[in-house]
Regions:
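Divalent metal-coordination and catalytic microenvironments
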Residues: 1, 6, 24, 35, ...
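Histidine-rich, glycine-flanked metal-binding segment
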Residues: 1-29
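Active-site microenvironment of metallo-dependent hydrolases
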Residues: 4, 12, 53-54, 234-250, ...
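Short, ordered loop/turn segments at secondary-structure junctions
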Residues: 13, 64-67, 95-97, 132, ...
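Di-metal (Zn2+ and/or Mg2+/Mn2+) metal-binding site signature of metallo-dependent hydrolases
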Residues: 25-49
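Active-site neighborhood of phospho(di)ester-bond hydrolases with catalytic His/Asp-centered motifs
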Residues: 28-35, 62-65, 93, 128, ...
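Divalent-metal coordination cores built from histidine and acidic residues
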Residues: 49-154, 216
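Histidine/acidic residue-rich metal-binding segments in metalloenzymes
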Residues: 109-129, 135-197, 203-223, 234-248, ...
């Protein structure tokens, strides 16, 4: 694989100033986690990158829903700033439900007007998971304001079906990660949604869903973790774990890697990555086994960021003073 200035030149008999012999190992595109709440790991984005990079993750689509509910715009700004020095790409979605429900007491409120302001003010990839499916289906005025944006709109619609599902999709929602069985996943694919098969700490849906994926609908499936604890990431990885589990279930390995990289990139309009091909970003995973459990090298933009399970970069953190001391207890 020839690389120059972080871009893949091609595959063939190339000579370079620096060469690495991978000794017959497998070479794959960097993995994409299509939906995660970094706060669930209990670490900052800059430290999170050190957790997942050795496991081959080079791009993450993160929804900072939890910190937004506590610290509002200040929390969002911290997450964006703290991720800037990460060698992996952390793309943030703007949380769409702050508070999560109208009955919650939260530290902030992001309504339709503020949503539009924040989308124009900061570099958000799109709108985070729309949990208020009832509001979408019934055309709630404030929800409609939030959906009136030219960007990716993540979904959250457990067990939604029939005409209600159709109405939800008409709101411009493009994906869902809440499927719990094959029937639900296939109905949502038929309705035009992309499906992120989730394998996290609390919710583990891969076993129940991987059978729904066929060669015909493969482009509509990718992987995500949603919420995964640090100790589990250290033990088994994130997207690499999805690859392993899928292969153990008898799933085609090439299709598993496609879901782990190319599909997730395309679904999130990241057309410059997801393949070992000319003019793509040199995000590359070198693994000694097909199940991606013995990852030897991880490259981001052509630079070595992890080797043999160890990161090759230091953590650079943003100033966190605006998002600390946020627990307030009423005086007795």
């Amino acid at each position: 694989v020839g690389i120059k200035d972080g871009i893949i030149l091609g595959i063939g008999d190339y000579e370079g100033e620096k060469e690495i012999d991978v000794n017959g190992a497998y070479v794959a595109p960097g993995f994409v986690d299509c939906h995660i709440h970094i706060e669930s790991t209990m670490v900052t984005p800059s430290e999170f990158s050190r957790l997942v990079a050795p496991w081959g993750v080079t791009t993450v689509i993160a929804d900072p829903h939890e910190i937004a509910n506590v610290a509002g715009e200040k929390g969002l700004k911290f997450m964006l700033e703290d991720s800037k020095n990460s060698p992996i790409d952390i793309e943030f979605m703007l949380p769409s439900c702050v508070p999560a429900t109208p009955f919650d007491d939260s530290g902030a409120v992001i309504d339709g007007d503020l949503t539009k302001e924040l989308l124009s003010k900061y570099d958000f990839k799109g709108l985070g998971e729309m949990m208020n499916s009832v509001g979408v289906v019934n055309c709630d005025e404030d929800i409609m304001k939030k959906l009136d944006c030219d960007c990716i709109k993540d979904g959250h619609a457990p067990m939604l079906e029939g005409k209600e599902l159709n109405a939800y999709v008409c709101g411009g929602i493009s994906n869902d990660h809440e499927c719990s069985n094959e029937k639900e996943a296939l109905e949502k694919v038929s309705a035009g949604l992309n499906i992120y098969i989730r394998q996290g700490t609390g919710a583990k849906n891969l076993d129940a869903l991987i059978g729904a994926v066929t060669p015909y609908n493969l482009p509509h499936f990718a992987f995500c973790t949603d919420d995964k604890h640090t100790e589990e990431i250290m033990k088994e990885g994130t997207i690499s774990n999805c690859i392993r589990l899928a292969i153990e279930k008898g799933f085609d390995p090439i299709s598993a890697y496609t879901m782990a990289s190319y599909n997730g990139a395309m679904m999130n309009r990241l057309y410059d990555r997801g393949a070992i091909a000319p003019n793509k970003i040199a995000d590359i995973v070198v693994t000694e086994d097909i199940s991606a459990q013995n990852i030897k090298y991880v490259f981001k933009n052509g630079q070595l960021i992890a080797r043999d399970g160890k990161v090759n970069f230091e953590r650079v953190s943003a100033d966190s003073k605006d998002v600390t001391n946020t627990v307030n207890i009423k005086k007795m």
